[in-house]
Amino acid sequence: MTPLLKLIKKQDFIILIILILLIPVVTRLNKRINFIYILFTSNYITLILNIAFLVMMYKKVMIFNDLSHTLITRMGYKNTKQTIYVFMVIITLLFLTILYSFLFLVYGFSHMSIKLLLMLVIYSLLYLFEIFIIYLQFNRKSNILYIALPIIINLVCHYMFF
């Protein structure tokens, strides 16, 4: 797992942090109830931040595809798939934790209901599902559907349900 952490480039990490820090500027602080409301109603988070992260994860899978023969030879096919999947889930959960923490610190936790917390859990599970679709690209030929489908799911769920 530790060698895979080297694949997280400082440049990618800095770009994501800058995009997260821009949330208050883009969404404006006025008339916003709490951080979950911001998460679901902000087009910036869905259109820019989430898609940027999905594209970055897709690029990581493409790097894994280039290294797949070496990794499979050293670790075995099953161990390689498990390690890469765990890596992607951990990075996704880390991203969501940073995003949720920042939104909580900036916008607070007022007017919270069980319905909003349930929506937050559903949003997180949806995001993990999108990452799983990207993960399916591992050890296969490059196909644009593996990135287009998560982006379409992200947009449809944002505009139809949230």
Residue ranges and their predicted role:
Residues 1-13:
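Aromatic- and glycine-rich beta-strand/loop motifs that create alpha-glucan
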Residues 61-90:
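Helix-loop-helix units of permease transmembrane domains in multi-pass membrane transporters
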Residues 16-20, 142-157:
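Central hydrophobic cores of alpha-helical transmembrane segments
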Residues 1-4, 151-162:
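Short amphipathic alpha-helical segments
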Residues 15-32, 158-162:
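Alpha-helical transmembrane segments of multi-pass membrane proteins
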Residues 11-17, 45-48:
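Alpha-helical transmembrane segments
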Residues 25-49, 55-57, 83-140:
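Secretory targeting signals
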Residues 68-78, 103-111, 143-149:
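Alpha-helical membrane-embedding segments
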